[in-house]
């Protein structure tokens, strides 16, 4: 098990979606249906660090636009909790197309977390 800098009781099957839009949240919810016990927590940009520290997600999902706000901080945040940082272009994308692209990455991340 990894050492942790943040107080946490157990590894979780949480995915934190930062900033939406709604289609991205829907895509993450549907992609997570293949992962037993997975649940989605959403947050806005200003409380992303708090939510990640609270839940220790195996994946952090956001749009490329949100990521562009502070790439170095998001990379560090994901690294601190050993989470996948999944970024996607949401401009013109459908929830279905984002779900299909996201599903394999989430499955790989959850398997890596619990190896």
Task: Annotate the PLM regions.
Residues 72-83:
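Short amphipathic alpha-helix used as the core "switch/output" element in two-component signaling
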Residues 33-41:
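A generic structural motif
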